[in-house]
Amino acid sequence: MQRAKEVMKVSDGSLLGEPGRTPLSKKEGVKWQRPRLTRQALMRCCLVKWILSSAAPQGSYSSDSELELSAVRHQPEGLDQLQAQTKFTKKELQSLYRGFKNECPTGLVDEDTFKLIYSQFFPQGDATTYAHFLFNAFDADGNGAIRFEDFVVGLSILLRGTVHEKLKWAFNLYDINKDGYITKEEMLAIMKSIYDMMGRHTYPILREDAPLEHVERFFQKMDRNQDGVVTIDEFLETCQKDENIMSSMQLFENVI
């Protein structure tokens, strides 16, 4: 419950902010700067917490503020290549891999594991549907399993990628059937799944019609040719022109 409250203090539960609303820093006359993800922020990521809790040696104390773990013996093949592909350090990759292998000895994560992770971090709500959508976004080839390489590449984009990279990833998440377009039904399904995951014990209390209102506002702004769908170009252009959406990219860490 506490985690949901922390999330809701800075977000309405969406992966993108409210379109057209001026950020607080802008109102105060302060120039907005894209937030830099700190190690502390990285440690708030559910998937990272899950991995590192398993990476820590048995009986040892693991601090939330410390990502690098000592005595890492596991190492994935092509570590240097992964370091080049991501924005994680070598020690971070080693730590993530150790936990990954401890939790998933086969080297693959399945959808049930994702659902278990999110049910643990969001016990006050129903995280099943959101975990399903998130898993499919990580499962690039659609084979029902996620390799470590795909896992950390996705995490790198979400946690340390550029705004453009995060927006492309968000589009892929919303594009549930992967046809290259986002429909109102698809965006509404994602929004509802996030609100369901947050549960009814959040602050401020969420209205049941909030997801639909959110989607209607976004489509009014994004669907420029009024054809009922949003393309990747419409999505990127609209989001990057909206300062509130840009600043809200940091909120990915709250539901990943």
Swiss-Prot record:
Stored InterPro entries: EF-hand-dom_pair (IPR011992), EF_Hand_1_Ca_BS (IPR018247), EF_hand_dom (IPR002048), Recoverin (IPR028846)
Phosphoserine PTM positions: 14, 60, 63
Location in or out of the cell: Cytoplasm; Cell membrane; Endoplasmic reticulum; Golgi apparatus
Region (Disordered): 1-30
Keyword annotations from UniProtKB, A to Z: Apoptosis, Calcium, Cell membrane, Cytoplasm, Endoplasmic reticulum, Golgi apparatus, Ion channel, Ion transport, Isopeptide bond, Lipoprotein, Membrane, Metal-binding, Nucleus, Palmitate, Phosphoprotein, Potassium, Potassium channel, Potassium transport, Repeat, Repressor, Transcription, Transcription regulation, Transport, Ubl conjugation, Voltage-gated channel
Residue numbers binding Ca(2+) 1: 175, 177, 179, 181, 186
UniProt GO molecular function: calcium ion binding; DNA-binding transcription repressor activity, RNA polymerase II-specific; potassium channel activity; potassium channel regulator activity; RNA polymerase II cis-regulatory region sequence-specific DNA binding
Binding annotation for Ca(2+) 2: 223, 225, 227, 234
SMART domains named among the record's database cross-references: EFh
Subunit structure: Binds to DNA as a homomultimer. Dimerization is induced by binding to calcium. Interacts with the C-terminus of PSEN1 and PSEN2 and with PSEN2 CTF subunit. Associates with KCN1. Component of heteromultimeric potassium channels. Identified in potassium channel complexes containing KCND1, KCND2, KCND3, KCNIP1, KCNIP2, KCNIP3, KCNIP4, DPP6 and DPP10. Interacts with KCND2 and KCND3.
Protein's job: Regulatory subunit of Kv4/D (Shal)-type voltage-gated rapidly inactivating A-type potassium channels, such as KCND2/Kv4.2 and KCND3/Kv4.3. Modulates channel expression at the cell membrane, gating characteristics, inactivation kinetics and rate of recovery from inactivation in a calcium-dependent and isoform-specific manner. May play a role in the regulation of PSEN2 proteolytic processing and apoptosis. Together with PSEN2 involved in modulation of amyloid-beta formation.
Name listed for the protein in its UniProt record: Calsenilin
The species this protein was found in: Bos taurus (Bovine)
